[in-house]
């Protein structure tokens, strides 16, 4: 799971917000014009999903902080 294992819950939430903003920017750029790395959208989307899973695990008590 990439390098998110050592993040605290607050760090994960902040990183998720940052990635969501970056993903939104890439979506706009792809609609309006040229994107340098089109696969970056997929990577960011998957990272957001990983973070969502880990945050949910912390909230359910499956994963300990």
Curated annotation (Swiss-Prot):
Signal peptide: none annotated. One of its GO terms (molecular function) is structural constituent of ribosome. Gene3D superfamilies: 1.10.287.310. One of its GO terms (biological process) is translation. Keywords: Ribonucleoprotein, Ribosomal protein. It comes from the Bacteria. One of its GO terms (cellular component) is ribosome. Belongs to the universal ribosomal protein uL29 family. This is Large ribosomal subunit protein uL29. The lineage of its organism: Bacteria, Pseudomonadati, Spirochaetota, Spirochaetia, Spirochaetales.
